[in-house]
Amino acid sequence: MHSQIWVVSTLLISIVLIVLTIVKFKFHPFLALLLASFFVGTMMGMGPLDMVNAIESGIGGTLGFLAAVIGLGTILGKMMEVSGAAERIGLTLQRCRWLSADVIMVLVGLICGITLFVEVGVVLLIPLAFSIAKKTNTSLLKLAIPLCTALMAVHCVVPPHPAALYVANKLGADIGSVIVYGLLVGLMASLIGGPLFLKFLGQRLPFKPVPTEFADLKVRDEKTLPSLGATLFTVLLPIALMLVKTIAELNMARESGLYTLLEFIGNPITATFIAVFVAYYVLGIRQHMSMGTMLTHTENGFGSIANILLIIGAGGAFNAILKSSSLADTLAVILSNMHMHPILLAWLVALILHAAVGSATVAMMGATAIVAPMLPLYPDISPEIIAIAIGSGAIGCTIVTDSLFWLVKQYCGATLNETFKYYTTATFIASVIALAGTFLLSFII
C-alpha cells in the first residue's frame, strides 16, 4: 500500500508529463497519454504484463462503445456540411427580426454544433458571420465570439459529442438526461458569455471588419440548400430517440415489449445509425447526390476521426491504469478529505487541464479519471451532474494552447491581446455560468 504523498505525487507528475510532452515536446496526445499510463503503472508497482493488459482493456472498453457512435456521428456531421444544412439553419434564423444578430449566432452554434466538431463548425459557419457583419456593418467580434462560444459549449456538455459521450459513459450517466441538462446549461452559458458580455463592453469592443483574405467566403445560394424542416428533423432525430429511451426508463415497466423496443432504438449506437440513413436520404438523395458521392463524403469524414478515436482510446487506457493500480481508490479518499464540493472539483480540474493541454477532449478525460473514483462517496450527487460539471470546466480558458484560439484570431483579424481580452474572457465567463447552472440543477434534480 503506497502512502498518500506517493499517490498524489505520482498523479501530479503524470499530469505534468502529459502537459510537457504535448505542449513542449509536441507529442501527439495519444502518445502522451500512453506514456503517462506506463509511468503511473510503473510508479504504482504494477507488473509489465498487468500494465499492458490494463491498457488493452481500457482502450477496448472505451472504444467498444464510442467508436461506432463517433463514426456514425461523423457521417451525420459530414452530410450537414456538404448539403448546406447548417447554412439553412443560419439563414432561417437570420429572418427572425425579433432576434439580435449575436443571439442568432448563439442559436446557430448550439443547433448546428450538435452534429459538428467544434473546429469544423467554426470553418463551416463563419461565412454566415461574415455575411451578417457586412450587411449590418457590425464588428465581426460581436458575431464570431458568440458563435464560437456556443460551439465550444455544445462540444463539451452535449452528447453525442465524443468527449461529452465519453464522460457520460465512464460515469454511468444517463445520456438522454445529460443531453437535456447540457442544452439548458450550454444555452445559458453561451448567451451570457457571448451576447451579454459583449453588450456590457459596448463601445469598448473594437470594430473588426471581415478580413480581406476571407472576403470571398460566402454562404451558398439558398435555392440549393435543403429545407429547414428536413434539416431540423435530421439534426434532432438522434437526440429525440435517445430522449425517448430516457423517458421509457422513467415511466415504463421493464418487462413490456414496448420498453424493450424503445431501449433498443434509443441506444446511442442505434439512434445515430437510424439518423445516418435518414440523413443519406433527406440531405443526400433528395439533394440529388448519388450513392457514390455520399460514399466519398463518408470516407472523407472517416479520415478526420482517427485522431479523436486514438486520443479517446488512450484516455481510456489512462483511466484503466488509475483503477488497476489502486491509485484511483486512494485518490478518492484523499479528495473526499479535502472537503471540496465534487461539482466544484470536477469543474476546476477540467478548467486547469484545458488551459494546460489545450484540448477540451483530453481535459475532460483527465478530469473524469481524477473525479470518478470519489463519486461513490457522494451518492446524493448524480453522475449526470458531474458530467455537466466536467464539461462546464472544459469550456473555459481557451488560450494559446488551444487551436480554436488561433482559429478565432485568424478569422476575426484580431491581435493576440484582443483575442485574449474578448474570446478567452467570453469562454471563461461561459464556463463560470455553466458551473452556476450545474449547481442550480443539482438542487433541483
UniProtKB/Swiss-Prot annotation:
Keyword annotations of the record: Amino-acid transport, Cell inner membrane, Cell membrane, Membrane, Transmembrane, Transmembrane helix, Transport
Observed effect of gene inactivation: Single deletion, grows on D-serine, D-serine plus glycerol and D-alanine. A double dsdX-cycA deletion grows in D-serine plus glycerol, but not D-serine or D-alanine alone, growth on D-serine (but not D-alanine) is restored by dsdX, while growth on both D-alanine and D-serine is restored by cycA. Double dsdX-cycA deletion cannot take up D-serine.
Superkingdom of the organism of origin: Bacteria
Membrane topology term: Multi-pass membrane protein
Regulation: Uptake of D-serine is inhibited by carbonyl cyanide m-chlorophenylhydrazone (CCCP), and at high concentrations of D-threonine, stimulated by D-cycloserine and not affected by D-alanine or glycine.
Family: Belongs to the GntP permease family.
Cited PANTHER family: D-SERINE TRANSPORTER DSDX, GNT FAMILY GLUCONATE TRANSPORTER
Protein's recorded name: D-serine transporter DsdX
